Amino acid sequence: YPPASPYWLKFSPDSSYSIYAYRHNLYLLNRQDTVPVQLTTDGEKYYSYSNQKDSDSDKNTTPNIVWAGNSKVFYCLRQDRRKVENCWVVDNLAEPRPKLRTYKFPMPGEKYVFTYDLHLFYPETCQHIVVNIDKYPNQEVRIVASDLENCPEDLYFTRKSRTCDKMDLCRVDTRTGDVFEV
């Protein structure tokens, strides 16, 4: 990695690209060019490409992405929490007085829950695709510990029905975006 890099940059394994988030969208920096390229325009609070999903910051932030070992692709699993209601908890350990903390949390039986979409980005062409991961209504999606460092062609995820009675292990071909149930 280049020396003295800002903490909010995520570098590709070969250090030829770096990614950062600004106002919930992704920006690409090429090592040969100092002009950032905006990769996304649909990021917003509670539906962000940034790790700072709940804040409206005017500062550059760390992106919620993972690079493949070959530096040819990276992915972002986005969680849409815009319609989910707020939940509150009292932080009794806060100093000097307890504080009320707010976060998004879907309660059992509520209509709206978190939804997910998986994006694959190709920095060489500045293109990206949205992978079709939908199968169950209101499904939960998690990335499984994939070895993108040594096997950059395969990304694994699980999808689970809201009732938790069905679950699939799936493989994504990162070159095409095709999904295969394992």
Regions from the language model: what does each represent?
Residues 31-34, 122-126, 174-177:
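Short loop/turn segments that connect beta-strands within beta-propeller blades
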Residues 26, 36, 74, 118-120, ...:
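Hydrophobic beta-strand positions in blades of beta-propellers and related beta-sheet-rich domains
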Residues 39-64, 76-130:
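Predominantly five- to eight-bladed beta-propeller fold
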Residues 127-131, 135-161, 175-176:
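Long hydrophobic segments that form regular secondary structure
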Residues 5-8, 62, 96, 141-143:
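Conserved positions at the start
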Residues 15-25, 30, 63-66, 75-81, ...:
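Beta-strand C-termini and the immediately following turn/loop, strongest in propeller blades
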Residues 1-46, 53, 136-138, 153, ...:
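A conserved hydrophobic secondary-structure block that centers on an alpha-helix together
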Residues 4, 11-14, 58-63, 102-105, ...:
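Short alpha-helical segments and helix-capping/turn motifs at coil-helix boundaries
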